[in-house]
């Protein structure tokens, strides 16, 4: 009886394992990533980047359209977001290298509860970051760019076309690759 029970358990485990392997193989072959663009390349389908209003540290309104004719890197972040904090040194490095050629908009997603302007300002000061920081106090900028999770980054060329958008942490290599592509035109 024990041997039969053991054999049935082993057989069931083997069938489940085989089903998992075959399912994985099937799904892997049919997987098509959405909007994936290799580092340093741009999508062939450019979309005009939507305009929005954010606020600088003094509370002055800043329109995205104020930067028309210049390439722009937008990064949506918050102090409570571990991946945002982790990628910030790469953005600081990129700003130091390309800040004269590209507009950097580091947009703090400021909901007033989980993230406040004061939290963000203190964080930026403590870390010594020099890139420009803006505050999305009504979450409208994050909304029009589909920043449903943080961090989120968008690359806009000088023609105002959104050439790449990414949800999630960006490697330094990818960040610099997309910046180089923005500067090619």
How would you label these PLM feature ranges?
Residues 73-74, 104, 153:
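Hydrophobic beta-strand anchors of alpha/beta hydrolase catalytic cores
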Residues 102-115, 130-138:
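Thiol-based oxidoreductase modules, predominantly thioredoxin-like and allied folds used
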Residues 121-159:
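Short, internal strand/loop/helix patches
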Residues 155-185:
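Thiol-/selenol-based redox modules, centered on thioredoxin-like
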């Amino acid at each position: 009886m024990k041997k039969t029970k053991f054999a049935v358990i082993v057989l069931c485990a083997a069938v489940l394992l085989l089903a998992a392997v075959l399912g994985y193989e099937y799904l892997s072959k049919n997987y098509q990533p959405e909007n994936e663009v290799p580092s340093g390349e741009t999508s062939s389908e450019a979309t005009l980047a939507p305009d929005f209003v954010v606020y600088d540290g003094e509370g002055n309104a800043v329109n995205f359209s104020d930067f028309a004719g210049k390439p722009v890197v937008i990064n949506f972040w918050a102090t409570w977001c571990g991946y945002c904090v982790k990628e910030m040194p790469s953005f600081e490095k990129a700003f130091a290298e390309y800040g004269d050629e590209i507009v950097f908009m580091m947009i703090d997603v400021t909901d007033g509860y989980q993230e406040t302007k004061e939290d963000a300002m203190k964080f930026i000061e403590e870390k010594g970051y020099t890139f420009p920081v803006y505050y999305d106090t009504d979450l409208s900028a994050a909304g029009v760019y589909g920043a449903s999770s943080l961090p989120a980054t968008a690359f806009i060329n000088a023609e105002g076309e959104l050439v790449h958008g990414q949800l999630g942490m960006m490697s330094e290599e990818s960040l610099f690759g997309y910046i180089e592509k923005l500067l090619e035109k």
